[in-house]
Swiss-Prot record:
Protein name: Probable dipeptidase A
Keywords recorded for this protein, A-Z: Dipeptidase, Hydrolase, Protease
InterPro entries documented for this protein: C69_dipept_A-like, Peptidase_C69
Catalytic residues identified in the record: 10
A GO biological-process term: proteolysis
UniProt organism field: Streptococcus pyogenes serotype M18 (strain MGAS8232)
Length: 472
């Protein structure tokens, strides 16, 4: 079998319902391709008749029968499909979400005790195997955990599940073990590509879950690195403290926490950054977009900034990186009619150059502009148009920044207005066609994105190296 595809570059933020501006749970993650690669994406709805009953992986020899009662769910799979499904993020008809996966770190002690399984599951498979069959976030943890125990995994991953009430975060440990923690309601979680959970209570199954033999596994292989053994730190036991982490991972958690808790002074290279924090104020969708677009603004680490040195500007990996494929914010809102409670905000391409677009998820189809991505570059779909804007704007980012900011603000305002209008119509007893509303949102965004591309191309052409100020 060919070498497995690994997308070890994602960034996750989770927002508990008492930490969010509207009482919602929010799960968000950038899906980033490996260095030197770009992965076209599309957003679709998977109906029960389209869900496989016998699943076969492309990346490994894994296969299994699936239940015959799948629910409809949204998905953001690879557009070309040659490497497998890679569904990544979605909401099912029970308004339960799943985001998979955040590739995380491990260590040789763990792998020596429970090696990875070449024939197991990976990021390619997880959403397809779990999301259509779960009716709560907790059920998602338990279903994925059972599959991990039975079949194993060939990579280390973090996975988020949410519903109206709870967010759960699961991290794999070696080939067959796993651990999960419920996100505190008044907190947010920042998780770059490293093992994150830093506190666990074995005697509190309401908020903590794990594979059945995890305590014995820890004791047998001397994995608990704390002195007292009273405060178990899974990150010490199962994670890493590598030089690479200080440049690739910890700075991303630091910059998110710097924005959401500016009163806390921390070191971007610290291995002690908390997995979860209570923000200084409630967190909005716009905040989530901002932190997932971060390139260390207003620090010496910003590759586009005026501060710092040529060395400092390249020392840390940005969150808003060039090779982001798609970003989803899975937004489950309380006290709303069931058919509009779940919103999937979607973006394609590099985050500093794009916008987040909200779609109702209890539908049968997604507009073509977001669902019909193909291999060749085109302005007929949202993915490639965003890629073109980013590539054109990047060399002169500061020149284009105002246009990009205006586009973001105007399109997200339109998104909020659409959500408010539909809710008002339903409360007034009117019938609303959610697919039609999604289409109107798509049409609006398509027009605004084309206008932005026109402006960016015009300005970028006037900034070309071979320009000359005189003409006949």
């Amino acid at each position: 079998m060919d070498k497995k595809i690994q997308r070890f570059s994602c960034t996750t933020i989770l927002v508990g319902k008492k930490a969010s501006y509207d009482g919602s749970t929010m799960v968000a993650r950038t899906e980033d391709s490996q260095n030197g690669d770009f992965t076209p994406k599309k957003m679709i709805v998977v109906k029960p008749e389209d869900q496989p009953r016998h699943y076969r992986s492309v990346q490994s020899s894994f296969e299994m029968d699936l239940p015959d009662n799948p629910m409809t769910y949204t998905s953001v799979p690879d557009a070309l499909g040659k490497d497998g499904i890679w569904a990544e993020a979605g909401v099912n008809e029970a308004n339960v979400t799943m985001s998979a996966t955040e590739t995380i770190t491990t260590n040789s002690r763990v792998l020596g005790a429970d090696p990875l399984v070449a024939s197991g599951i990976g990021e390619e498979d997880m959403v397809t195997l779990v999301l259509p069959y779960i009716r709560s976030a907790r059920e998602g943890v338990l279903r994925l955990g059972a599959i991990l125990e039975d079949y194993g995994t060939y990579e280390s991953n973090g996975v988020a599940f949410s519903d109206e009430h709870d967010i759960w975060w699961l991290e794999t440990i070696g080939g067959h073990h796993w651990i999960a923690r419920r996100v505190p309601d008044d907190a947010y979680v920042t998780n770059p590509n490293q093992f994150g959970i830093d506190h666990f209570e074995f005697n509190n199954p309401e908020d903590y879950l794990c594979s059945a033999d995890l305590k014995d596994f820890i004791d047998t292989y001397h994995l608990d690195l704390t002195y007292s053994h009273e405060h178990f730190n899974p990150r010490y036991a199962f994670g890493s403290q590598r030089d690479k982490d200080r440049h690739y991972n910890t700075p991303r958690a630091w910059i998110m926490q710097k924005f959401l808790n500016p009163e806390i002074v921390q070191d971007p290279r610290s291995f002690a950054l908390a997995w979860c924090q209570k923000p200084y104020r409630k967190i909005t969708v716009e905040d989530v977009k901002y932190v997932l677009s971060s390139h260390y603004q207003d620090t010496g680490y910003d590759p586009y900034g005026s501060e710092g040195t040529p060395v400092s500007k390249k020392v840390f990996r940005p969150i808003g990186i060039n090779r982001t494929s798609q970003t989803a914010i899975l937004h489950i809102r309380p006290n709303k009619p069931q058919e509009i409670a779940a919103i999937q905000w979607i973006a394609y391409g590099s985050m500093p150059f794009n916008t987040m677009v909200p779609f109702f998820t209890q539908v049968k189809t997604i507009p073509d502009y977001f669902a019909n991505t193909y291999e060749n570059v085109s302005t007929d779909n949202f993915y490639w148009t965003n890629r073109l804007i980013a590539a054109l704007a990047d060399p002169h980012y500061n020149h284009h920044e105002t246009d990009l900011d205006n586009y973001l603000e105007e399109t997200m305002a339109k998104g909020h207005a659409m959500l408010h209008a539909v809710e008002a119509q339903l409360l007034a007893g009117e019938t609303v066609d959610l697919e039609e509303e999604n289409q109107k949102m798509s049409d609006y965004v398509q027009g605004e994105t084309q206008t932005l591309l026109n402006k960016i191309l015009f300005d970028a052409s006037n900034l070309m190296t071979n320009r000359f100020s005189l003409s006949d």
